Amino acid sequence: MHVKKYLLKGLHRLQKGPGYTYKELLVWYCDNTNTHGPKRIICEGPKKKAMWFVLTLLFTSLVCWQWGLFIKTYLNWEVSVSLSIGFKTMDFPAVTICNASPFQYSKVQHLLKDLDELMEAVLGRILGPELSQVNDTRALNLSIWHHTPLVFINEQNPHHPVVLDLFEDNFNGSASNSPAPGRPCSAHRCKVAMRLCSHNGTTCTFRNFSSATQAVTEWYTLQATNIFAQVPNQELVAMGYPAERLILACLFGAEPCNYRNFTPIFHPDYGNCYIFNWGMTEKALPSANPGTEFGLKLILDMGQEDYVPFLTSTAGARLMLHEQRSYPFIKEEGIYAMAGMETSIGVLVDKLQRKGEPYSQCTKNGSDVPIQNLYSNYNTTYSIQACIRSCFQEHMIRECGCGHYLYPLPHKRKYCNNQEFPDWAHCYSALRISLAQRETCIYACKESCNDTQYKMTISMAVWPSEASEDWIFHVLSQERDQSSNITLSRKGIVKLNIYFQEFNYRTIEESAANNIVWLLSNLGGQFGFWMGGSVLCLIEFGEIIIDFVWITIIKLVALAKSVRQKRAQARYEGPPPTVAELVEAHTNFGFQPDLATPGPDVEAYPHEQNPPIPGTPPPNYDSLRLQPLDVIESDSEGDAI
Amino acid sequence: MAPGEKIKAKIKKNLPVTGPQAPNIKELMQWYCLNTNTHGCRRIVVSRGRLRRLLWILFTLTAVALIFWQCALLISSFYTVSVSIKVHFQKLDFPAVTICNINPYKYSAVRHLLADLEQETRAALKTLYGFSEITSRKRREAQSWSSVRKGTDPKFLNLAPLMAFEKGDTGKARDFFTGRKRKVNARIIHKASDVMHIHNSKEVVGFQLCSNDTSDCAVYTFSSGVNAIQEWYKLHYMNIMAQVSQEKKINMSYSADELLVTCFFDGVSCDARNFTLFHHPMYGNCYTFNNRQNETILSTSMGGSEFGLQVILYINEEEYNPFLVSSTGAKVIIHRQDEYPFVEDVGTEIETAMATSIGMHLTESFKLSDPYSQCTEDWSDVQITNIYNATYSLQICLHSCFQAKMVENCGCAQYSQPLPRGADYCNYQQHPNWMYCYYQLHQAFVREELGCQSVCKEACSFKEWTLTTSLAQWPSEVSEKWLLSILTWDQSQQIKKKLNKTDLAKLLIFYKDLNQRSIMENPANSIEQLLSNIGGQLGLWMSCSVVCVIEIIEVFFIDSLSIIARHQWHKAKGWWARRRAPACPEAPRAPQGRDNPSLDIDDDLPTFTSALSLPPAPGSQVPGTPPPRYNTLRLERAFSSQLTDTQTTFPH
């Protein structure tokens, strides 16, 4: 009951608006509002009134339009960037070092023996007897060969290309213009291609090459991949270059370091790689000064004479700078360091920090990417390179049933090899050039929000100099092999200096271009500019609208009431008596109202009026005013109940 | 009545013309100050005391001044830009890659053209430095240059004699060819000494260039004979080559099959057909990969060296021109497809017997053109004709400008740049003194006297590939043997000899990752932002708005002007009336106030009666009853509609 009472009271309060008609309300609003235009509408002459009315409308619509623009701009989630450049103490980048050759030839020779003999025979067949030194009388293991053979394609007659197996002298195609056996073809007549077959040789494709060099290199790499995929990981690591053989000297700042400061990681392309300052187990090392003296100095031995001859033709060290706890994609982003040279690398850390959703489509840690990160086995952070490679491996497993040797394996899967998956090479080469696969991966993977690049300034000089060569090699050989003879050579030795430049960071940081403060101040500015308004004006306007609604309700109720009353009671017909009439009726007895009109008025309140007493003070006319309202009030109460 | 007039009359009736309410300026001002929406003015009128009023006037004026100042700042900084840097990971278009051999033409092919020049160069070397036999390590096949034309007149040394100047005595010079000392009456221009002050401690070497009549000569000296002889040789070389036709030159240079031994892009084999020929005057035949042949631009969707371009180049050092080029290798330019490769200006040199791996990062930049900065989208707003078949760049514009000036001043075009329409390359036969003219012009160009630097604007958008170059030994020791033999087999059609590793260079060009950075300039301000900033300023200082501005215009211009006009009109009318009728009868004074003794009108608030301005009660008063105290009847507005009724009933 109490609640109802308060509700009613509140309703009554609300009803007491600034007027009882629309016009009054509007006039009151225009007169009292703080916005600048409306006031002028009511206090001017008719011409200016019209002008001000139009102006006010115009300004209102302008404000609305501009507000719309601002809100739209705000919802675009634009960013502004701030750039800072300077020097500060920073964590030294993680440095990954690999040898260009993945394995020591002396240790993998037993695995590659058959393949190498075959390769030499292939070269012999291509080059012809006078150019090749090998005599192909040895028994060759042709099982590898028959799986994916290299063929000559004689395209002299473009409509009937002649396909000729390198080791067969009979022809698969038409027998026209056959070259002499033993010297099958020369370069300008034939192209070397690789035959890739699937499904037990039912469908075959030829992978064409414009030069024989590419053909034999690709063929060898494919075969070697097949062989290494079957070897367990521990053996592969043992066949690679051990850290103590690779890293001869290490100096970080003034502190000496050695191969134990490097974390080993096995890379399928480059064998054993070693990462300095990876920050996986201990804290990352900072560098507080620019310049060579405060950076990392390394002397490496590549051992070029022990390279796998057909697998890698480029000699040197491969190195890469990357962030702590990130996987080194050294094949993509690494650089070479040349043997017999001192390579100095000045580093500038180029960092880009982005805001995530809704400003840009980047991911903080890769958790919202629909692809399983296969590199998470290494405990590394998310990167888009990792995502794309994981995506490729996923496709590979789906299409070919086995994982590619170059990428990590998901749980319970196997690397591809010829024995278990005979048509994998065919499947892989189709997938590799498939653009659809790449585009799906690019689409599925998101960039990470923090992107760090290491800008390098590379310079080189000959090292060691001729004068110092002798003693340096003596010392290094003594240290590594405890031998008094020189076991190193200029062809394998690499010196590296990695250091921060004078300006070591450049950070580009995103921040929201349009924040809520910006939006409000611009909205306020626009409203103020056109109309001199503020939030309070908006509240005023809202109040007026509430009043408006109330007046409408009141009017509607009154209308309904009057219609009902008209039907029920005839005496409520007609307008209520005017004050003047009532005044006359109560005060002046000598004065008789006009008999023609007042009929209903006189009869209107017969039971309420006492018989006129002379000298009575005039009634409190103010109370009379409430008469029509009383009716309504009771009605609205009825409505409320 | 005409309908037009009818409407006019109607408008007049409905919207009567009324002037400003205030009768004079002072009242108008007062009215304005009291009623305006701006905050300061009201305080001026309302506050009491002279000091306060003065203070408020001061404050208001300061606020107005501040508004003007701030708004001026806002407007003047309207055309500023904000820079945004965005990174996209996406499939990237591979750039066009132009590969040139550093040596332009096979020496064996051009030798017949350059025989005279070579002989004279050797002769000059002999006279000054005292050695004659230059034996190339590589070139042993032809030493037949020696004494074939001993008796012929040296034409090149006569045209531009090489000389050595002794220290401190620039007037005397020793002629290279004759060895005689002779007097030189010419301006001595020390090449490079304009920018670097070199103290010539030893003999300097230079050559003399004369205009048509030999009186006006200039001598260009160099600190080292190497530079002097190379420069001198190059001048004559250009002279000779300018007279050779383009087809002949293309034939003398390297073919694509010769230069490119193998090619591999994105895991797929490619060959010479994927390269387009581009003939450069100073570098001979260059080949451009991915130059929008077949209207498709190759793109990369994986980063890393195996998905980029891998080529092995054949660089035959035996065919090198000993005087023109002194380094061995190839030049690589990475550029946009529609861009002209400036081989001589930019480019990375690659070495033989090495694998050069070039990792790229793509950065795109967009600038806003006029009125934000002085950059240009295309040729439309640069008054230079494009002589290159490529899109706009600053370099193209500068070169075009120089070439145009060259044609204008010297009458012929410089050899290392394309030919403008209707001009010829410079050579001795037609333009005997072009070298002098060229040097003069070039010096003026370097000193920015030609106006090219001010005419040419930078381009608004450009792509930039940041390169990370690293070298490795290639082929490795153990793979050298088989690799070279199979490469020899591959090239057996073009080259008949066995390849050496110093004849080959491997080049890898690839995207390190597919991150593309775009640096974009955006307008920092928009119109709406400017307006809202101005609005903020107006609101902050004075709570003013456009409405106030309109008010000010209305009050200070229209109303006050009309008041003044009316005032003047009245004055003029009064003056006219006084002149016409100096004695005008005074109009009877209008009755003031109501003659109702019983009714006292309150000053402060209007009563019912006063509000109605009732006429005085009629003389016949009703006796007995006092008039009602109408004050009590002061009605509120709600009753105003009923007043007419009261009025009608009252007189009874």
UniProtKB/Swiss-Prot annotation, chain A:
Residues 609-620 have a biased composition (Pro residues). This is Epithelial sodium channel subunit beta. It catalyses: Na(+)(in) = Na(+)(out). GO terms for cellular component: apical plasma membrane; cytoplasmic vesicle membrane; plasma membrane; sodium channel complex. Disulfide bonds join C98-C273, C185-C190, C197-C204, C250-C257, C362-C449, C387-C445, C391-C441, C400-C427, C402-C416. Ubiquitinated. Can be ubiquitinated at multiple sites and undergo monoubiquitination and polyubiquitination. Ubiquitination by NEDD4 or NEDD4L inhibits the ENaC channel through endocytosis, intracellular retention and degradation of its individual subunits. However, some studies could not confirm the ubiquitination of this subunit of the ENaC. Phosphorylated on serine and threonine residues. Aldosterone and insulin increase the basal level of phosphorylation. Glycans are attached at N141, N379. NCBIfam families: ENaC. It comes from Bos taurus (Bovine). Pfam families: ASC.
Curated annotation (Swiss-Prot), chain B:
Residues 610-631 are annotated as: Disordered. It is found in: Apical cell membrane. One of its GO terms (molecular function) is ligand-gated sodium channel activity. Gene3D superfamilies: Acid-sensing ion channels like domains, YojJ-like. The gene is SCNN1G. GO terms for cellular component: apical plasma membrane; plasma membrane; sodium channel complex. Keywords: Cell membrane, Disulfide bond, Glycoprotein, Ion channel, Ion transport, Membrane, Phosphoprotein, Sodium, Sodium channel, Sodium transport, Transmembrane, Transmembrane helix, Transport, Ubl conjugation. This is one of the three pore-forming subunits of the heterotrimeric epithelial sodium channel (ENaC), a critical regulator of sodium balance and fluid homeostasis. ENaC operates in epithelial tissues, where it mediates the electrodiffusion of sodium ions from extracellular fluid through the apical membrane of cells, with water following osmotically. It plays a key role in maintaining sodium homeostasis through electrogenic sodium reabsorption in the kidneys. Additionally, ENaC is essential for airway surface liquid homeostasis, which is crucial for proper mucus clearance. This is Epithelial sodium channel subunit gamma. The chain crosses the membrane at residues 55-75, 538-558. Glycans are attached at N212, N500. Residues 76-537 are extracellular. NCBIfam families: ENaC. It comes from Bos taurus.
